[in-house]
């Protein structure tokens, strides 16, 4: 008979005591194209005519979902999800898990957890039957939001059984079979009130034994899975194998390593630079590595900020997700992008530009705000590269300036069609300025300009990094336009090679093997 973890630890089982949302409205399509166009019009924050929806709940969800990190209104998040769910439940759920997916998707926690809580209270059976999938795409602390939902008891049972399994592996010396559950389980003596609350819910359930048993279980398992936090707390610096640290831990605790183990840590970084050892960066976003510079005084434009060797090493170690494309990166540096969205925009621009396989467009970007400029990524350090493309123009969002710049140069030099960029990746919050023709959308005006100049329109990739309103630059009827969202470049190759219309691209991402287990 399988023993409980309290029995395994030899401790007494003394128990520790102490409304639905409407779907986002996707305008119904009439048989009349003019009526469809009129019903779907709205305006950006800067007064530009645009589309309220792509005319597909799935595409709207995909385009906004991974860019909602700063959205305070949970009803908007759930509304977008429900519009997609009403259109195709399986695709909506797969997109939700793609948004959360730490390794192959966008790694967004909050949006996933908001929707997971809603599902727990409104699609309880589905959540219960798929509890095991949550940790596969996210982390074990994602389960904690379910402790205040209709799935509370089932979640507690699931976590308790996993903890028992891990302890069985511990006592059988099967350490490689132990999950990361113990790393993310809440401690009742934590500093965070929310963490304390979750720990109390677990301990008062009667499924985790006494507080003493619970603490001992977590302590044993955390030692087995070799989490660096335990070694830091115990001041066991010489026992830390830096080459085995997870990506985020290597970045987060770098200053502690310098303070307490400087000589050995510096030698490790030298070995990384020489190719003798590796440093992990596979779960980091490019913006994670720009923030240590951008948060310094005048960090974006100052190439002489304090250079961080850990950041530099991890930037070089980032996986290369950029496919072979004949294209240019265009990044929004307007005032509304200040803060994290600006970091995401600049970091993705530098990341894509320097990994661009095109001999012509490699290391070139076009930042835009009130005007657009050609910029070349230059420098040896990441700080120098960021400074080389930062313009300091943080005013309005004149997207048309980008295309005016490209077409004016092309016409003046009689550039043939085959030498024009085939892709343009536009990284922005999508709050574009009004066109010179106020009755046309930015996309319509861009199409007009290319036609007037005698060039074919390139494939336009609108990459949403900060969704504040339900508006989109294109609809599903616009061919040659791809809509993405989020801060991770992990999906670039699939997205840019997955098709020529939005639904084809989304299907190529969420209908692959990685998300095949997610069914409704």
Residue ranges and their predicted role:
Residues 2-344, 354-520:
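Long lumenal/extracellular ectodomains of secretory and single-pass membrane proteins
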